[in-house]
Each structure stands twice: as structure tokens, then as C-alpha cells.
Amino acid sequence: KRAMEHFRQLADMGAAVLVITHDLELALETVDRVQVFYAGHTIEDASVDDFEREETLRHPYSRALWRAMPKHGFHYIGGVQPYVKDNLQGCPFAPRCDMASRECQGEIPWKVSGSGYVRCIL
């Protein structure tokens, strides 16, 4: 936590700071923007404000991460994680996504979503 406070001070002085972490709650206290990665692919870019409520997040994995935070109940993300070296087609989260359709297996373009971007057809 002290390291994150130091990063925040650096950012307040105008320095660019990139934080890579699995501790989403801690990151949300420190950063302005979040890029969500899954299986080596960026799937959503959002402001910290978008992480205030689940419904402002667009990608199902981002929403699952939101629900998995301790303050939201530690909800388990079901399914099997892909092997990152596999040649994944389409959305890498599709095999674990309750809302996935056949379209999710194709190319997924970036689209504007709120204050960020998302790679999801939903």
C-alpha cells in the first residue's frame, strides 16, 4: 500500500506511472485509468469511475473481476482458463462467458464505451 501511495505522489507531480497488478481494489485507489487484460489481450480500457458500478463496465470479464473483488463478495469466475500459447480466435474470454455467441469466435473490433474502449460485441 505504501508503494502505491508513492506511485500516486509521482503521478501528482506529473510523472506517468504504469501499475501492473492483480489487486484491482488497490489499483482503483491509486490510478486514473484501468486496462483489463485477459489471456494476454487487452479487452477493456476504462476510467476508475467506470469501476464504481458493475453496469458501467462493458466486457463480461471486467464485470466478473468487479464481482470478484472482496468488497463485492469474492464471486468465483467459472470455467477453465485458456492456455496463453494457444492460437485463440476471437474473444479469449468466450469459452468462460455466459453471454458468448458464435460471433465471439470472430474478429472483435474495438469500440468506444463510455470514457474508454472495449473489445466485445455485446
Which residues fall in each region the model found?
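Short catalytic/signature loops enriched in Gly
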Residues: 47-122
